[in-house]
Amino acid sequence: MIDRREIDVLRSLLESNAETTSTDLIERFGGDTASLQSVIESLERDGYCFEQKAGTIRLLSEPDAVRPQSVGARLTTHTIGREVYVFRETRSTNDLARQAGVGKASEGVVFFAEQQTAGRGTHGRNWVSQGNQGLWFSILLRSTLPVERWPVLVQMAALAAAEAAETWIDDPIAIKPPNDLVLGGGKLAGFLLETCNAWNFQVLGIGMNVRSAPQIEGYPTSALDDFARKRVPLSELAAGILNRFEDWYLRKTVEWVAEAVANSKFPL
């Protein structure tokens, strides 16, 4: 579990245009110079780079990978992303979320993997999840929607992912019902909803090709970076999807979502 202070310090640096004083951080989050330095050193061990001089701290760069600190520092959510876990490798993030659901974890926990060895799509198909080449993650939900309306959760995820991705590109993204996003004629992202009625939870899996897309014969694919105006930061994109998903999930009615998909600016 990531030290919450790492997220708070990183958020403060991002909000202050990457630089602030050590005194300000200590006043905001408590502790002393030694405890603040411990937080900075922990972040540095995880790939963050800082410049410290004359009592100021400047964030120079973040890891080119999904990190819970970078995602958490950009979240504006109340439920989705309340806990964020990142695994270098796992069989399937949906399996991790399912285990958490059975263990009575709170709604909104998110599991990311840099690489999945047994990721899956709809109808049991294999989902190729190459190391650090995209976003592969699952959200634990405890929706009170009637069972017959659970598929709308996939529509919410598709809208959220399309909205987040479009901020980096000029080309149109299309929602291809029931489970895909299409960009440039190839599959950009897919969504998988798995449910467990006995334990009253749903697992929403999301996969998006970002750095590159797997080459699959007879099945066109696309990667976001190939269309982006600049290299897309994975953690920033992930936070954007989670922020938008919560907006759809907590604030929009099922009818509103259905209308949004039907009249979407992301038509196929």
Q: Which positions does each model-derived feature cover?
A:
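Long, positively charged amphipathic alpha-helical accessory segments at protein N-termini or as interdomain linkers
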Residues: 1-46, 145-173, 183-268
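N-terminal lobe of the biotin/lipoate ligase/transferase fold
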Residues: 2-166, 231
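Short loop/edge segments at beta-strand edges and connector loops
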Residues: 88, 175-177
